[in-house]
C-alpha cells in the first residue's frame, strides 16, 4: 500500500488514542459526580424519614382531637335530652340504656377502624420500601449499561459520518459535538431522576387521599344504620368532622407545596452547579473557540440548555445590507431543533413540567425568549414560489377582487421571473403579478389613487409603486410574498402625487419626481423606515415637465431625468445633504442640426456619459465633468454635464432607451428593437415582426447561458459574425399588446392583447359564464370569467368606439351602441352582424341599450336626449330587425332606459328616466313607423335629480320602481300610479348611486332575501333589501379611483364586474353575502342602528329634544290654553308631523311633506286596507332620518341658490335685490301668499312670540305689523340671508349650519 493509503489509518489510530484519554477523564469525572449524587440521595432519604415521622405524629394528634370532639358532642346531646325529658323520667332511662349500648358499639367500630388503618399504613410502608429497592436496582442496571457503552470498541466509520455531518451543517467540530452530546445525556439522566421523585411524591399523596376517602365512606355507612335522632346528632358531628378533614387536607396540600418548593430550590442548585462545571470545562477549552462559535452560530436559551444552530440565509441579496436588515432584523432568528426534539421526547416532557412549576413572571420571560428565537419573518424565509403558493384569503370581505382584465399601457411591464414567465403591470390602482404559465394573478392592493409610476430592483425582489392624487402613497412591496414592507405617507404634500420613480441597483435608495406644478426631486432611504426624504430639490418650471428618472447603475449617487426639452443630471452628496444638478440648455444651434424632443435618458455603460434619445431618431451624448481636487471655485465644486455630440441613429422616433449587460437597447415607433455596443455600433436588431410602437422593454434577470451545439442563436452584425447572446425579454407596445421574446430560436409569443382606449361597456351572458367588454378603440372582447380565458373578439373599423353593450334575455344576441351613433345587433357567439346593415339614426353617442323580455323590441338612448325603438318583423318567413321610431322626449341627459311587463297582458312596457326629473312611459302598442307614442309623464323629484332606475324585486304585494337620486335617497314609486310610496336613505359613500342592479338568485329559496349591487363615482357596493335606512345593511369598496363607467352581474349572482372607463380595465369582484350579513348582525337590531345616525345617540341632547318636541306636539293638538285633563299617548296625529320636523331643524317643502303623509298613510293599506293617521316616536325617528338631508343643512346649498338667482355685486359676491327677493318668494316654486310671507318674517324677526299660526289655540286679535322695507337690507347675500334673516350659525369645523 502507498503512503497515501496509510495516512488515514494512522490518523484514525492517533485520534482513537486521543479519544481514549478523553474517555478516561470523563469516567473519572462521572465517578466523582456519582459519589456526590449518592450523598445527596442519602440526605434526601433521611429527610424523607424525618418527614414521615412528623406526619405520623400529626396523624396521632388529629385522632386525639377527633375523640375529644366526639365526647363533647355526646355531652351536648345528653344535655339536650335532659332539657327535653324533664317530665318523662321513664323515657330518659330507656334512652340512656340505648345510648350506652350505641356508645359501646361505636367504640368497638372505632377500635376496628383504627386497627385497619394501622394495618394499611404498615402495608403502605412495605410497598414504598419495595418500590425504593426496585428503583435502586434499575439505577444500577442503567449505570452498568452506560459503562458497557463507554467500553465499546472504536468505530472509524462513525467518526467519518459525524465529520461529514459537521462539515455539511457548518456546526462544531466532531469532538466538541460529542462533548455537547454527552452533556445533554447527563442532563437527561438528571431530569429523569427528578421526574421519578416527583412521580413518587404524587403517588404517595394519592394513596393518602384514598385512605382518607375510604375511612370517610365507612363512617358514613355506620351512621346510616343508627336511629333517626342519633342520625341528626351524627350529621352535625359529621359536618364538623368534614370541616376538620378539609382543614387537614389543606394543611397537607400546603406541606406538599413546601416540599415542591424545596425540590425546586434543590433543582436550581444542581443547575447552578452544572453551569459552574460547564464554565470550568469551557475555560479549559479556551476562550478562542467560544469567540469563533459566537460569530458563526447563534444560541437559543431553552430551559438552561444551550443549543447552537446555524442562522438561516436570507433569500434576498440585501441580507448583508445594514439598512435593509433593519426591516426584518428582529424576525430573522429561528431555532431549528426539530431533530433534537424528535430524539429526546423525555426532554420535552421534563421541560413542560419544569415550566409548570415556574412563577408567572418566569413563565412570561421564558415564553418571550422562546418566541423571539423561534419567530421568523415571512419576508426573510420566503422564496420566489411563495407568492403563488398562498392560500385564498378567508371570506371576511363582502367584495374581493379576483381578476383584472386590462393593462394600463402608459406604464411599463416588468419581467419578474423567467421560469414561469411572471410579469408585473398595473391596472387602475392595483399592481398585478401575473403568472403566464399558471394563468393566475396576485393583486398588490393598497393605493387610493391610480398608480402613476412603478419600478423594480435589479434582483426583482423589491417593487416600488406610487400614485397620483390626494393622500398619495409610495409603497415598497416584497415580490416574493406580496407584503408591503414599507409605506411612505404624505410623500407629496401638494396632493398631486408622483410622476416618476427609480430605485438604485443595490436597492438602498429610492428617487421620485412629483407631479405638481413645481416639481420636486426627492431621495428616500426607504430601508430605514423614515417618512421624510433624505434630500429634496425643487426644479424650476423652465426645465419642463420631467417624466423620466434613472439611477446610474455604477454609482447610486448619480441620476438623470428629462422632459421633452431638458435633460438634468443630478449628483447626491449624502454627507452634506445636497443634491446638485446640471441642466445645460440645448438648442438647434448647439449642433447646427434639429435635435427633436427627448424621450428617455440613460447612463453610458463604460464611459462617464449620459445618453438622451429623441423623437427624431437621434442620440445626444453628454459628458460628465467631475471637479478636480485642486479646483477652488464654487462653480466647479460639483459635477456637471456638457453636450458632446449628436448621433443620428435612425429616421424613426426612439421611444425606449435602456442598457442591459454590454448593450445599449432602443425601441422605436415602428416596432423595431435595436442593440448597440458601447461605441454605438449596431450589433443586432429585430424589425420583421410588425409590432406596434414600442412602449416598454424588460429583460429577464437570468443571465443567458453559453451557447451550445443545440443553440439556435442569431449572428450579430459584426465582421466576425459572433453569436448574438442576450437575455430573453418582454415587449410592451402602445396598442396594449404584450409579447415574450425567446432569443434562442427568435421565438415571439403574444401573451395578451388588451384595449388601448377607455372601456365603458360591459355585459354578462344571461346563463353562461361569459362577459363581453367593449372599448372606445372599437374592440369587443369576450372572456370566460370562470376559467379566465379569452375566447374571441372583434375590432371594428376606425372611428367606431363601443359605448354600450347588452345581451338579450335568450343570450343569442348582443346589442351594441357606438360613440358616433351607430347601433349594431350582433350574434352573441360569433360577433357577426345579425342584421345586414347597422342602424344609423343618431348623430351622437348611444349611451343606453336594452331588450324587452320577449326579445321583440330593442330600445336605445343617446346623449341628445333621444329614445329610439327597434322591433322584430317577419319577412319572407324570417325574423328581421327594423327601425320603429325615435323621440326626443327629455330636456336633459337620459339616466336610465328600462323595459318592463304589463301584468294584465304580458306585453312589454318601456320607460325612460332623465336628468330633467321626468319619468316617461311609452305606449308601444300605439306606436308606429316614425311615431313613438307617450303614455304618461311624471316628475320624480323637486330639487335633486334622478341617477338610475330599476324594477324593485317582488318582496311585497305591491310592484315598485326603485329610483335613486343625487341627494343620496332611494325612492319607491308605485309601478302603476307612479306615486312616491317611500323615501329612504341610500348608501352615502362620497357620491350618490349612479347605477344599480338586483343580484340574481340561484334558486327559488333565495327569492325572499334579495340584494342590490350598485356603483357610484368610484366605488362598488352591496345593499341588503328591503332598504330601510339602516347604515349597516350596505358596504362599498373603491374599484376605480378615476371613475366607474359601467357594471354587470354574473348570471348566478356570484360575481360583479366594473368597467373603469379611462383606466382601460374591467375588474371582477367575488361577492360574499355572509360577511355583509355578519356586519348587519353586529350593528344591532330595531332602532339601535338608527340611534347612531343622530348626534349624541339615544342619550344625546338632540334625541332628548326630539322627545320633548314630540310630546309637546300632543299639547298643541289639544290646545295650549285648554284647562281640560291632558291625554298623553305614544302617537301624534299626522298634521303635527311638519311642525315637529321644522322644530328639530329639518325644513321640508310642501311636496316632501305630502310624500311623508303618503308614506305613512299607505304603509299598511295593501295588507289591511286601512289608512294610518298617526305615528309613534320610533317611526317618526325613521321618517326623519330617511327624509332629512344626509349631511345636514350646508352653506354650499344656499350659496348655489344665490349663484343661480343672484347677480355679482361690487364686492364680487352673488346677491339678490330686496324687491327681487320678495318677488321670488311670491311667484316662484312653492310660492307663498303675501300673508304667509309676512307672518314668516314676523316670526323670524321675533315679532310673534307665540310662533305665527302654528299654535292653533293661540289668539291674536290684530295681525303683526311689519315693514319689510325697513327690516330687510337692500342687497341680500347668502351670508346675510343665513345669519341675519334665518338666524343660523356656521360651524367652525365644517360648513354645516347650526340652528
Swiss-Prot record:
It comes from the Eukaryota. Residues 17-45, 91-162, 176-189, 212-228, 269-280 have a biased composition (Acidic residues). Keywords: Cell projection, Cilium, Coiled coil, Cytoplasm, Cytoskeleton, Flagellum, Repeat, WD repeat. Gene3D superfamilies: YVTN repeat-like/Quinoprotein amine dehydrogenase. WD repeats lie at residues 484-526, 534-574, 585-624, 643-678, 681-741, 745-785, 791-828, 838-874, 881-924, 935-975, 981-1027, 1033-1071, 1109-1149, 1169-1209. SMART domains: WD40 (SM00320). Residues 1-351 are annotated as: Disordered. InterPro entries: EF-hand-dom_pair, Quinoprotein_ADH-like_sf, WD40/YVTN_repeat-like_dom_sf, WD40_repeat_dom_sf, WD40_rpt, WD_repeat_EMAP. This is Cilia- and flagella-associated protein 251. It comes from Mus musculus (Mouse). The lineage of its organism: Eukaryota, Metazoa, Chordata, Craniata, Vertebrata. The gene is Cfap251.
Amino acid at each position: 500500500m502507498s503512503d497515501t493509503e496509510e495516512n488515514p489509518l494512522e490518523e484514525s489510530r492517533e485520534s482513537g488514542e486521543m479519544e481514549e484519554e478523553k474517555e478516561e477523564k470523563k469516567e473519572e469525572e462521572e465517578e466523582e459526580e456519582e459519589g456526590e449524587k449518592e450523598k445527596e440521595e442519602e440526605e434526601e432519604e433521611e429527610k424523607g424519614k424525618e418527614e414521615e415521622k412528623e406526619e405520623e405524629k400529626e396523624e396521632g394528634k388529629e385522632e386525639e382531637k377527633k375523640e375529644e370532639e366526639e365526647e363533647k358532642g355526646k355531652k351536648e346531646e345528653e344535655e339536650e335530652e335532659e332539657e327535653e325529658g324533664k317530665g318523662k323520667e321513664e323515657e330518659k332511662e330507656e334512652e340512656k340504656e340505648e345510648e350506652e349500648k350505641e356508645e359501646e358499639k361505636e367504640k368497638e367500630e372505632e377500635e376496628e377502624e383504627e386497627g385497619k388503618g394501622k394495618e394499611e399504613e404498615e402495608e403502605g410502608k412495605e410497598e414504598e420500601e419495595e418500590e425504593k429497592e426496585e428503583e435502586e436496582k434499575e439505577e444500577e442496571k442503567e449505570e452498568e449499561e452506560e459503562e458497557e457503552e463507554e467500553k465499546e470498541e472504536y468505530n472509524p466509520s462513525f467518526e467519518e459520518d459525524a465529520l461529514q455531518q459537521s462539515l455539511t451543517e457548518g456546526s462544531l467540530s466532531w469532538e466538541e459535538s460529542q462533548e455537547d452530546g454527552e452533556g445533554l445525556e447527563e442532563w437527561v439522566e438528571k431530569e429523569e431522576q427528578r421526574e421519578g421523585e416527583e412521580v413518587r411524591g404524587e403517588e404517595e399523596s394519592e394513596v393518602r387521599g384514598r385512605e382518607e376517602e375510604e375511612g370517610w365512606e365507612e363512617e358514613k355507612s355506620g351512621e346510616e344504620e343508627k336511629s333517626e335522632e342519633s342520625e341528626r346528632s351524627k350529621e352535625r358531628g359529621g359536618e364538623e368532622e368534614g370541616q376538620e378533614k378539609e382543614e387537614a387536607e389543606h394543611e397537607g396540600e400546603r406541606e406538599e407545596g413546601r416540599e415542591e418548593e424545596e425540590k425546586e430550590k434543590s433543582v436550581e442548585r444542581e443547575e447552578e452547579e452544572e453551569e459552574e462545571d460547564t464554565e470550568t470545562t469551557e475555560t479549559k477549552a479556551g476562550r478562542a473557540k467560544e469567540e469563533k462559535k459566537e460569530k458563526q452560530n447563534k444560541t437559543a436559551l431553552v430551559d438552561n440548555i444551550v443549543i447552537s444552530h446555524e442562522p438561516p440565509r436570507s433569500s434576498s441579496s440585501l441580507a448583508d445590507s445594514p439598512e435593509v436588515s433593519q426591516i426584518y432584523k428582529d424576525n430573522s432568528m429561528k431555532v431549528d431543533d426539530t431533530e433534537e426534539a424528535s430524539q429526546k421526547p423525555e426532554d420535552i416532557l421534563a421541560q413542560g413540567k419544569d415550566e409548570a412549576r415556574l412563577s408567572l413572571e418566569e413563565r412570561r420571560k421564558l415564553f418571550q425568549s422562546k418566541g423571539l428565537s423561534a419567530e421568523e419573518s415571512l419576508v426573510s424565509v420566503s422564496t420566489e414560489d411563495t407568492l403563488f403558493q398562498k392560500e385564498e384569503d378567508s371570506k371576511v370581505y363582502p367584495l374581493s377582487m379576483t381578476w383584472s382584465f386590462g393593462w394600463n399601457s402608459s406604464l411599463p411591464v416588468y419581467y419578474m421571473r423567467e421560469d414561469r414567465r411572471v410579469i408585473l403591470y398595473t391596472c387602475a390602482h392595483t399592481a398585478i403579478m401575473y403568472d403566464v404559465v399558471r394563468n393566475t394573478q396576485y393583486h398588490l392592493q393598497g393605493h387610493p389613487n391610480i398608480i402613476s409610476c412603478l419600478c423594480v430592483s435589479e434582483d426583482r425582489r423589491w417593487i416600488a409603486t406610487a400614485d397620483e392624487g390626494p393622500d398619495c402613497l409610495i409603497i415598497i412591496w416584497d415580490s416574493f410574498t406580496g407584503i408591503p414592507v414599507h409605506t411612505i405617507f404624505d410623500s407629496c404634500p401638494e396632493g398631486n402625487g408622483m410622476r416618476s420613480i427609480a430605485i438604485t441597483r443595490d436597492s438602498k435608495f429610492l428617487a421620485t419626481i412629483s407631479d405638481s406644478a413645481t416639481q420636486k426631486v426627492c431621495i428616500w432611504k426607504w430601508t430605514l423606515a423614515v417618512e421624510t426624504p433624505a434630500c429634496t430639490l425643487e426644479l424650476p418650471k423652465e426645465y419642463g415637465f420631467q417624466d423620466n428618472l434613472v439611477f446610474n447603475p455604477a454609482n447610486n449617487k448619480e441620476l438623470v431625468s428629462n422632459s421633452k426639452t431638458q435633460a438634468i443630471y443630478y449628483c447626491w452628496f449624502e454627507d452634506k445633504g445636497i443634491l446638485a444638478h446640471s441642466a445645460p440648455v440645448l438648442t438647434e444651434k448647439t449642433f447646427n442640426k434639429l435635435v427633436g424632443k427627448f424621450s428617455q435618458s440613460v447612463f453610458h455603460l463604460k464611459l462617464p456619459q449620459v445618453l438622451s434619445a429623441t423623437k427624431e431618431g437621434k442620440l445626444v451624448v453628454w459628458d460628465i465633468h467631475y471637479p478636480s481636487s485642486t479646483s477652488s471655485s464654487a462653480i466647479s465644486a460639483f459635477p456637471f454635464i456638457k453636450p458632446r455630440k449628436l448621433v443620428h441613429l435612425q429616421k424613426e422616433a426612439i421611444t425606449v432607451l435602456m442598457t442591459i449587460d454590454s448593450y445599449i437597447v432602443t425601441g422605436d415607433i415602428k416596432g423595431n428593437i435595436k442593440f448597440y455596443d458601447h461605441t454605438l455600433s449596431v450589433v443586432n436588431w429585430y424589425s420583421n415582426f410588425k409590432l406596434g410602437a414600442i412602449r416598454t422593454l424588460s429583460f429577464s434577470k437570468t443571465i443567458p447561458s453559453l451557447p451550445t451545439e443545440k443553440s439556435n442563436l442569431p449572428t450579430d452584425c459584426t465582421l466576425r459574425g459572433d453569436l448574438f447572446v442576450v437575455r430573453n425579454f418582454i415587449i410592451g407596445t402602445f396598442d396594449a399588446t404584450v409579447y415574450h421574446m425567446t432569443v434562442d430560436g427568435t421565438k415571439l409569443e403574444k401573451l395578451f392583447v388588451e384595449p388601448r382606449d377607455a372601456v365603458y361597456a360591459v355585459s354578462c351572458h344571461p346563463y353562461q359564464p361569459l362577459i363581453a367588454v367593449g372599448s372606445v378603440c372599437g374592440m369587443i372582447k369576450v372572456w370566460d370569467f370562470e376559467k379566465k380565458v379569452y375566447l374571441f373578439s372583434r375590432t371594428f373599423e376606425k372611428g367606431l368606439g363601443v359605448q354600450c353593450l347588452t345581451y338579450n334575455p335568450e343570450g343569442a344576441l348582443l346589442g351594441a351602441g357606438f360613440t358616433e351613433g351607430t347601433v349594431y345587433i350582433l350574434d352573441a357567439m360569433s360577433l357577426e352582424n345579425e342584421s345586414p346593415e347597422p342602424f344609423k339614426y343618431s348623430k351622437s353617442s348611444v349611451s343606453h341599450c336594452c331588450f324587452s323580455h320577449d326579445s321583440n323590441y330593442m330600445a336605445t338612448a343617446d346623449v341628445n336626449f333621444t329614445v329610439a325603438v327597434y322591433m322584430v318583423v317577419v319577412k319572407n318567413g324570417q325574423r328581421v330587425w327594423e327601425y320603429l321610431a325615435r323621440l326626443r322626449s327629455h330636456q336633459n341627459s337620459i339616466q336610465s332606459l328600462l323595459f318592463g311587463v304589463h301584468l294584465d297582458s304580458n306585453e312589454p312596457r318601456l320607460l325612460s328616466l332623465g336628468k330633467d326629473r321626468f319619468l316617461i312611459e311609452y305606449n308601444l302598442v300605439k306606436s308606429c313607423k316614425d311615431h313613438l307614442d307617450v303614455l304618461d309623464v311624471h316628475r320624480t323629484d323637486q330639487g335633486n335629480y334622478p341617477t338610475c332606475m330599476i324594477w324593485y324585486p317582488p318582496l311585497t304585494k305591491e310592484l315598485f320602481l326603485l329610483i335613486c337620486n343625487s341627494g343620496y335617497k332611494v325612492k319607491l314609486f308605485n309601478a302603476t300610479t307612479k306615486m312616491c310610496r317611500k323615501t329612504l336613505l341610500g348608501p352615502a359613500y362620497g357620491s350618490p348611486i349612479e347605477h344599480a342592479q338586483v343580484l340574481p338568485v340561484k334558486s327559488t329559496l333565495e327569492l325572499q332575501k334579495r340584494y342590490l349591487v350598485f356603483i357610484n363615482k368610484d366605488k362598488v357596493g352591496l345593499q341588503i333589501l328591503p332598504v330601510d335606512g339602516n347604515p349597516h345593511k350596505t358596504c362599498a369598496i373603491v374599484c376605480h379611483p378615476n371613475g366607474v363607467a359601467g357594471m354587470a352581474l354574473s348570471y348566478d349572482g356570484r360575481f360583479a364586474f366594473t368597467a373603469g372607463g379611462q383606466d382601460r380595465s374591467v375588474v371582477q369582484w367575488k361577492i360574499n353575502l355572509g360577511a355583509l350579513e355578519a356586519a348587519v348582525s353586529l350593528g344591532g337590531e330595531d332602532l339601535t342602528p338608527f340611534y347612531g345616525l343622530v348626534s349624541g345617540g339615544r342619550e344625546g341632547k338632540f334625541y332628548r329634544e326630539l322627545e320633548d318636541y314630540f310630546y309637546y306636539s300632543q299639547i298643541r293638538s289639544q290646545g295650549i290654553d285648554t284647562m281640560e285633563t291632558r291625554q298623553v299617548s305614544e302617537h301624534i296625529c299626522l298634521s303635527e308631523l311638519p311642525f315637529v320636523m321644522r322644530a328639530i331643524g329639518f325644513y321640508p317643502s310642501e311636496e316632501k311633506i305630502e310624500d311623508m303623509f303618503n308614506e305613512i298613510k299607505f304603509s299598511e293599506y295593501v295588507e289591511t286596507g286601512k289608512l294610518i293617521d298617526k305615528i309613534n316616536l320610533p317611526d317618526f325617528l325613521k321618517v326623519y332620518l330617511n327624509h332629512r338631508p344626509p349631511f345636514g343643512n350646508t352653506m354650499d346649498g344656499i350659496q348655489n341658490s344665490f349663484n343661480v338667482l343672484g347677480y355679482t355685486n361690487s364686492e364680487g359676491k352673488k346677491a339678490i335685490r330686496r324687491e327681487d327677493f320678495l318677488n321670488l318668494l311670491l311667484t316662484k316654486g312653492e310660492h307663498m301668499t303675501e300673508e304667509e310671507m309676512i307672518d314668516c318674517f314676523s316670526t323670524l324677526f321675533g315679532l310673534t312670540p307665540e310662533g305665527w299660526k302654528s299654535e292653533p289655540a293661540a289668539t291674536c286679535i290684530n295681525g303683526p305689523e311689519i315693514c319689510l322695507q325697513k327690516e330687510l337690507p337692500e342687497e341680500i347675500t347668502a351670508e346675510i340671508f343665513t345669519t341675519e334673516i334665518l338666524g343660523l350659525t356656521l360651524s367652525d369645523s365644517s360648513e354645516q349650519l347650526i340652528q
